[in-house]
Amino acid sequence: MLLIRRTINAFLGCIHCNLTATCILIAFVITMYVVLVSEPASVDGTMGNFLPFSKMDLATKRDRPFYSNCVNTQDYLLNPSYIKQNASFVMLTRNGELEDVIKTINSIEEHFNQWFHYPYVFLNDQPFEEDFKAKVRDVTVGALVEFGTIDEISWNFPSDVKDTFEFYNAIEDQGDRSILYGNLESYHKMCRFYSGLFYKHPLVQKYEWYWRLEPDVEFFCDITYDPFLEMLRTNKKYGFTIIIPELYWTVPNLFRHTKSFISQKGVTLGSLWKLFTKDYDIFESDDPELRDWINYDFQAKAKISEKIAIEQLLKKGDDFQQINDDKEGIMNLIHKARSRKHIVEDKFFNEEYNLCHFWSNFEIARLSVFDNDIYNSFFQYLEKSGGFWKERWGDAPVHSIGLSLTLDLDDVHYFRDIGYRHSTIQHCPHNAMGNEEFSYLASDSKFKRKNAAYDEGREFGCGCRCRCPKKKREIEDSMGFCVNIWVNLLNQQRGHERHVEALNGNEMEEHIREDYLRQFGN
C-alpha cells in the first residue's frame, strides 16, 4: 500500500515528467485504483460490501451528523437554550485575492452566516488596503469584520535560518524534485504560520472557537444549525469535512521527529493517534525474536514454521544420520542464516505514519486544542528541526498529528453533512429524505433563490438542501483509504480501538508445532 501511495504521489508531484513516463505511471495508478479503491471496505472492515462510501450510512454511536436533516433555523435561534458562542471565522489572505475572498464570503453567508452572524478575522502578512476592507465589509451582512497584520516574527523564518545558503538551497532543491509547492518560500511560511502561530494572533486570541476559511472555496449545502454550539453540547473539540492521504515526499521525516518528541517528553497519547498510524505490533508472542521479525500477518506462519523446524533439527544433537535426513530442518536453517531482517523504512518503535490527515483548510475547533503546553511544545520542537523549510511540511499533517497527541477519537466530529470544495477536491453529501419539510428562508433579499432545485434525497443522506457539482467525484470514494480507517475505529469499543486484531502467536505456534510433528515426527 505504501508503494502504491508513493507512486501516486510521485505522479501527482511530477510536473516535468516526459510523456512516456507519465503514461506508465497513469497505467499503474489506474490499475491499482481499480484493485484498491473501486471496492472500498465496508464499515466493519470487510471487503464484502462494494458500495462506495458516499452511498453508505457512516454514522456510529460515537459520531454522527448533529442533525439528520434540515432544521427550522428560526425556531432554533429562538429556542431559549440557544447560546451564541464566542467564535469567529479566520482567513489568511492577501490584497490581490479580493475576488476569491468575496466568493468565499458570499458562499458561507448564503449557506450559513446570514442567519448566525458570526464575525470574521482576516489576516495578512502585509497591511490590508482600504479598498479591500471596504469591499469585504460590503458583502458581509450584520457581522463584525476585523483585519490584522501578522508580525515579522510570526510570518518569516528566523534570520539565522532564512539568510543562509542552506535555507535557499533546500527550497530550490524541493522545486527541482517537483515537490508540490516546495519551491515557494511563501507556501512554507504559510504552512509554518498555520501549524503553530495563527492561534497566537491577538485578533484570534479573543475567541474560544474558530472556523477556518480560504479564498475561493464553495459550500454546497445549507447549514441550518450552529456547529459551534452543537460541538459544545456533544463535547467535540475539533471538526473536519475531508480526510485524505498526504503526499509522501512532503513529510518524509515528520513522523521521525514526532516520535522523538513523544519519547523525550513522555507524552501520553490520545486514541486519535490510531487514526494516523499503522501499528506493526500485530503479533502477540512470548518469543521476542518472532515479535521482532513479524511485521505483517502473512509472515507469521512461515516464521513460526521455520522456528519449529530448526528447533527439531537442533534436538537431534550429534546424530548426523538423523540430521542429514531432516531435509526440512536443514532448509529452514539455511534460509534463516541467509535471511536479513526486513526493515520497514518509515517504522519507528513499531509504528508508521499512514499519511492520513484532516484537510485543514476547513476545520472548526476550539483554540485550546492548539494553544496548550503539549501542542505548543510540539510545534517548537518541529520548528527547531527545520522541517518547515528543509522539507515541505504542511499544516494539515502537523495539525492532525499534533492533535492526536492529546485528543481522543470521541473529541473529533466528521461534518459529513457540510458540502465543501477547495481547489480540485470536494466533499458533497447526498441530501437527507424530507428536505422539503423546512423550506429555505433568506434573511436578506440578496440571498433569495429563484426556482432553486436541490438534489434528490436519499435514505442514507444527511445533507440539507445540497446542490452537488456533478462533474467531480466525491472524495469519500476517490480517496476512501482514510475514511475507512476513521469509520472502522469509530465502530469499535472505546478504549479498545485497533486497525487489525493482533494474532495470538502462542496459540498459532502450538497448532503449527502439532501439525509439524504429525507430518515429520520427532
UniProtKB/Swiss-Prot annotation:
GO MF assignments: alpha-1,2-mannosyltransferase activity; mannosyltransferase activity
Keyword Transmembrane in annotation: yes
SUPFAM superfamilies in the record: Nucleotide-diphospho-sugar transferases
Annotated compartments: Membrane
Organism domain of life: Eukaryota
Membrane-spanning segments: 17-37
Function: Possible glycosyltransferase that transfers an alpha-D-mannosyl residue from GDP-mannose into lipid-linked oligosaccharide, forming an alpha-(1->2)-D-mannosyl-D-mannose linkage.
Protein's name in the database: Probable mannosyltransferase KTR5
Organism of origin: Saccharomyces cerevisiae (strain ATCC 204508 / S288c) (Baker's yeast)
Lineage, opening ranks: Eukaryota, Fungi, Dikarya, Ascomycota, Saccharomycotina
Name of the coding gene: KTR5
